[in-house]
Amino acid sequence: MLNDFTGADKVYIACGYTDLRKGIDGLARMVQKQFELDPFTNTLFLFCGRRRDRIKDLYWEKDGYILLYKRLEQGAYQWPRSESEARSLTPQQYRWLMEGLKIEQPKAHRPVTELAVL
């Protein structure tokens, strides 16, 4: 379900460690207070614990929250640990993260920003 989640307009990850004992209210409060984002939008918020094999996802669905919990049987997520901020992900970065890859792929093709006909 999470590997191809397309229901959200935006995806944010909470960089660094998150205490996964937090439930819906604690995670929504974290989104609102710490990251200064609106948890009542069509946005998927991702949180990862210290062991990096478990994530919680918070999503508002017009009439209530959905809280998803995923535990990997093998391996770990390549989660950014350096900062305590919410970081927006592109759809490609989200797919990479769910596939066990880093969200910054040094060998991936970069989008062209300057177009010119030679």
Language model: regions and residue ranges:
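Polybasic/polar functional segments that serve as interface/processing modules
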Residues: 1-118
